[in-house]
Amino acid sequence: MRKLIVLSVALLLAGFTQLEATTDSTLRMSNVIYEGDVRAVRLYQQNSGFSFPILTLGGGESLVLEFDQIKSERDFYQYTLVHCDAQWNPTSLSRTQFLDGMGYENIETANFSNGTLTQYTHYSVSVPGEQTKPKIGGNFILLVYRNFDEKDIVLSRRLMVLNSQGAVNMQIKQSGQVELRSTHQQINFSFTKNANYFMPNAMQDVKTVVLRNGEWDYSIDDLKPMFIVGNEMQYNQTLGNQMDGLNQYRFFDIRSFRSSTAGVRQRLNIANQKHVILVNDKTRRFERYFNWADFNGRVLYDNKDLPMPAGTAFESDYCFVHFSVSADA
């Protein structure tokens, strides 16, 4: 017997909004939203919306932080950076020791939604600003707060500042364990330090983290090298560096509310709110594997109904997306 399981979730018409809000206002050194009306948070490199949030120390690059708040009034936000150790605990350094400038920036750019059923305010800012330039490399938490009160936290995001002291080479391959070959991937990598970089104890001084699809929720931490040959540390463990490969992500396109798009069965306006009904899906358990070229769960923010893409961030509407899957009872 098979039954249809129906689920609904609120999404941005131009893409996906991360459901990671918490009612606890205590700062967590991770990617967290602390207010329920904040949506669609993104932190990415200036010229690539899918990039990992990493900067090169003194390199002149910028990250872009964007987010929405589901209300038509503007709040006044600031951000700062918190320096962390390898385990993402705040260090004892004072802000003047790791940042140039006053140590905070105002988030000046705010656009009210235009032509949308859901009223929201879109905020954006370049990171770092003139008053928040990192002086050292390492792990940082970007902390957004309201009205100059760092206890009134809105969101936090992890980012890294790279002070390159070597090079990393990596290879992803099928698991070397026979029983895991159909489910896991093995990540072999090596780190070659610069010849003039002094490292007293490589086994203790080098901290590693391997992320699956750039997500901190699933990582392999603090692997130790199998071999150290000259300036090169080799991490080719048999078991420690393996990750389960997951399934292919399911795809749907909600970039338009006017024309047909992939995976969408119906579009509705109900009680002044947009709804999208996706095509009924089914389990792929017994189907032949098909390699779909996706973005590993990442989302493209776009709106095909706009004549110009410049307004995508504040002229795209939110909608409820209803999806269903047939599964064994």
Question: Could you say what each language-model-derived stretch is?
Answer:
Residues 24-27, 161-182:
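Low-complexity, Pro/Ser/Thr- and charge-rich linker/hinge segments at domain boundaries
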Residues 286-328:
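Basic K/R-rich, polyanion-interacting modules in nucleoproteins and related proteins
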